Amino acid sequence: MSLSNSLGLLGRKVGMMRLFTDDGDAVPVTVVDVSDNRVTQVKTQENDGYVALQVTFGARKASRVSKPEAGHLAKAGVQAGEIIQEFRVSADTAAQYQAGASVAITSVFSVGQKVDVQGTSIGKGYAGTIKRHNMRSQRASHGNSRSHNVPGSIGMAQDPGRVFPGKRMTGHLGDATRTTQNLDLIRIDEARQLLLIKGAIPGSKGGFVTVRPAVRSQAAKGAN
C-alpha cells in the first residue's frame, strides 16, 4: 500500500550517472527504469471496500507463477510481472484506468517535482555497533587494550540486572525496506521510459523500487 493516496510507478534501479547544467554544475542522478507499468486490477469501494490500483512491473516466466496468480492475471489479460503492488488512489483516478491498461510516465510525474523512492537497502550482513549505529571508537592507546572498537558497557549491575529492550548492539545490517523522501525529478526519458532522479536511492543495481509523488514535500531553503 502506498504512503499516500496517489498513483506511483514500479521500477528497477539501473545505476547512477551525472548530468551537467547550463552553468556547468554536475548533478548526480539515479536512473530508474519504469517501463511497462500495467494495471492488473482496479479495486472499488463497492466491491473491495477501498479504492486502489494494482500495478505490476517486469516479466516473469509462466512456470514461476502460482496458479491463483496466473488466473488473476489471465482475467485481466496481463502478462505476469516480477512484482505487484497496490496504490491507494482517489475514485476519479481509478476511473481513468481499467485492467490491462498501461500507466504512462507523464500521467504520473513531471520534471521538477519532488518524489519519494522506496526500495530494499543493500545487505551488509552481521555488523558491529560502530558500523551499524555510527558509534564512536574508544581510545587507540593510553591504557586501552583490545577494546578499541567494542561498544563498552551495555547496562548496570544488580539493579536492574538486565539489558533494557532496544539497546543498540551488534546485529544484522541492511536488507530492509527504506524510503528516501523529497528527491528532485531532474529528467524524464519518455522514449526509453526512464526517470532521472537527483541523488541516491535505496538498494543495489537491479533492485526493485517504488517511485511516488512526495508525501510531504519541503519548501525550498530561504523561502518565506
From Swiss-Prot:
The keyword RNA-binding applies. Residues 134-159 are annotated as: Disordered. GO terms for biological process: translation. The keyword Cell cycle does not apply. PANTHER family: 50S RIBOSOMAL PROTEIN L3, LARGE RIBOSOMAL SUBUNIT PROTEIN UL3C. Belongs to the universal ribosomal protein uL3 family. This is Large ribosomal subunit protein uL3.
